[in-house]
């Protein structure tokens, strides 16, 4: 268990260091090929991948990862950057200066021979044992067909390894050359004249499968040839300045000098061949870089859209909640007004003014509900809700435009990065090709046939260079017109629009119901008022009729009294007479 924890800790530290180096070297052309490794060891990439393909990871793990990533970007990374700058300034640069000052005084030729002698003896012993015990068994297993296939694979991975080794060394050299200077060339110059034949012999021929297994007789020879096929040695050989080349020529024997000339010619040939092979890698590099930039563009867009949509989703959630609260407030106001349509009229005992109560007669209402008042409530509700929904649609349109502008800005930024990368790599390749042409012009063979072949190869290489340059331009156009994935933005917009439309329809239907209910209440109240008026009118007419009858009866009674009085007077008069 302890070993497993140590292994996990070691891998975590290595991945962390790799990611930091990737971020530190992201703008360096020499380290560009390592971006694939950086990409597939980036935890953020795997977090995005698992979030897209696993709902459980997206809901449970991804939020915590985002929190940790934000804390790292805000709290940890600035501290590491500051510490790196301080360490580089305080420790690394002074250390390189001290080493450089010591290397000027150090004669490494003796130490080289001291280390080389035991290594040669060890190698002889190893190959003697190998030829005696291991080689016979391997010959039975490694057939000619298998060896041929193995050779192809080895050459393939050897070229790839050499390419990465070259760009890594260039990257390191580009970053620390201003401190160290040309110390490496000075150190190599101390013993290069002593092993000139070995250096040039390493590039005189292409190693065969038999070169991988040395015989006993070869091991017993006094003069050991360096059989390494590292193309880095070729680069070191052809990058000798004029002074070092003169020093080598002055200290070498005549036969070694002739061997140097042949080696130089072979170097040119191998450099041309290597240049032709590297064009295929260059094409693959352009394709890989294009895919990386597209993936980075899609990743940046996805990250921005995710954050923006989450933020706007919360904003619209609050807006819909506010809209719902306001609509309920308006609907409640209209409903109360509708309930108070059937009100009861009363008289204030103190002021003698009319007052109104609800239909139960227990609660006084502020005012008498009329059709004009309810119609005003409906118009106010409708206009307010329309303003709110229109404002939300306007905000949604502005958000969509903002996202599109940001996506275009991200695209332009990535295109600019690719253009800068393309300019640098084209410049580097043009320098390399011009350098090879210069080497061919000064170190080429006197044979006209060989010179014509070199010119033909140079012409083919320049055509391939032009093709690669056009490929970069086409890739740039492809990036400039690469459409972003805005499906989530469209889905979010459709969702919000659908919700707004649903709210508008529901509120319209509810207002229609309230309007119908208000009309019914008003019609009922008007009917009751008509009936009351008719009853009052009938009562008034009945009262008037009763009054008329009473008046007529009184008049008749008065006439009867007058007639009785007259008769009495007449009778009395008659009796008197």
UniProtKB/Swiss-Prot annotation:
Residues 1-23 form the signal peptide. Keywords: Coiled coil, Mitochondrion, Ribonucleoprotein, Signal, Sporulation. Transmembrane segments: none annotated. Residues 379-416, 513-561 form a coiled coil. GO terms for cellular component: mitochondrion; ribonucleoprotein complex. Residues 562-577 have a biased composition (Low complexity). It comes from the Eukaryota. Residues 525-577 are annotated as: Disordered. It is found in: Mitochondrion. Its main location: mitochondrion. Residues 525-545 have a biased composition (Basic and acidic residues). GO terms for biological process: sporulation resulting in formation of a cellular spore. Involved in spore wall assembly. May be a component of the mitochondrial RNase MRP (MtMRP), a ribonucleoprotein endoribonuclease involved in the cleaving RNA transcripts to generate primers for DNA replication in mitochondria. Belongs to the SHE10 family. Component of the mitochondria-localized RNase mitochondrial RNA-processing (RNase MRP) composed of one single RNA encoded by the NME1 gene and at least 31 proteins. Absent in the nucleus-localized RNase MRP (NuMRP). This is Outer spore wall assembly protein SHE10. It comes from Saccharomyces cerevisiae (strain YJM789) (Baker's yeast).
């Amino acid at each position: 268990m302890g070993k497993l924890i140590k292994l996990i800790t070691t891998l975590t530290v290595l991945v962390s260091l790799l990611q930091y180096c990737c971020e530190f070297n992201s703008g360096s052309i020499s380290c560009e090929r390592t971006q694939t490794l950086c990409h597939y060891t980036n935890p953020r990439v795997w977090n995005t991948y698992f979030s897209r393909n696993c709902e459980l990871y997206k809901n449970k793990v991804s939020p915590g990862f985002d929190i940790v990533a934000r804390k790292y970007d805000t709290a940890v990374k600035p501290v590491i950057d500051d510490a790196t700058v301080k360490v580089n300034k305080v420790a690394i640069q002074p250390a390189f200066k001290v080493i450089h000052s010591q290397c000027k005084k150090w004669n490494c030729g003796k130490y080289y021979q001291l280390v080389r002698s035991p290594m040669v003896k060890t190698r002889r012993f190893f190959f003697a044992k190998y030829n005696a015990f291991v080689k016979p068994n391997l010959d039975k297993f490694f057939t000619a067909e298998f060896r041929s296939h193995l050779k192809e694979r080895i050459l393939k991975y050897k070229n790839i390894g050499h390419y990465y080794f070259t760009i890594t060394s260039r990257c390191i050299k580009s970053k620390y050359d201003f401190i160290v200077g040309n110390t490496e060339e000075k150190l190599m110059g101390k013993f290069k004249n002593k092993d000139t034949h070995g250096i040039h012999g390493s590039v005189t021929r292409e190693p065969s499968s038999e070169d991988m297994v040395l015989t006993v007789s070869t091991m017993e020879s006094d003069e050991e040839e360096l059989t390494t096929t590292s193309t880095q040695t070729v680069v070191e050989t052809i990058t000798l300045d004029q002074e070092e080349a003169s020093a080598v020529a002055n200290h070498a024997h005549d036969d070694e000098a002739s061997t140097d000339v042949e080696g130089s010619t072979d170097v040119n040939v191998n450099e041309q061949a290597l240049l032709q092979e590297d064009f295929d890698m260059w094409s693959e590099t352009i394709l890989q870089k294009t895919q990386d930039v597209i993936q980075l563009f899609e990743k940046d867009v996805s990250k921005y859209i995710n954050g923006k949509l989450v933020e706007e989703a919360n904003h619209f959630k609050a807006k819909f909640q506010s809209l719902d609260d306001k609509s309920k407030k308006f609907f409640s106001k209209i409903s109360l007004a509708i309930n108070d349509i059937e009100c009861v009229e009363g008289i204030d005992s103190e002021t003698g003014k009319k007052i109104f109560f609800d239909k139960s007669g227990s609660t006084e209402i502020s005012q008498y509900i009329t059709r004009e008042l309810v119609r005003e409530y409906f118009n106010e509700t409708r206009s307010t809700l329309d303003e709110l929904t229109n404002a939300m649609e306007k905000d949604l349109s502005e958000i969509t435009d903002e996202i599109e502008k940001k996506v275009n800005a991200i695209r332009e930024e990535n295109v600019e990065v690719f253009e800068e990368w393309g300019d640098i790599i084209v410049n580097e390749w043009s320098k390399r090709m011009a350098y090879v042409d210069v080497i061919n012009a000064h170190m080429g063979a006197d044979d006209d046939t060989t010179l014509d072949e070199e010119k033909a190869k140079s012409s083919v290489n320049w055509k391939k260079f032009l093709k690669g340059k056009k490929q970069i331009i086409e890739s740039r156009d492809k990036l400039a017109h690469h459409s972003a994935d805005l499906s989530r933005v469209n889905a979010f917009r459709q969702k919000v629009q659908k919700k707004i439309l649903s709210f508008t329809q529901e509120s319209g239907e509810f207002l229609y119901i309230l309007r119908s209910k208000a009309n019914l209440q008003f019609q009922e109240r008007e009917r009751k008022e008509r009936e009351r008026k008719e009853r009052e009118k009938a009562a008034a007419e009945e009262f008037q009729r009763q009054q008329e009858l009473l008046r007529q009866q009184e008049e008749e009674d008065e006439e009867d009294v007058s007639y009785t009085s007259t008769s009495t007077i007449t009778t009395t008069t008659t009796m008197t007479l």
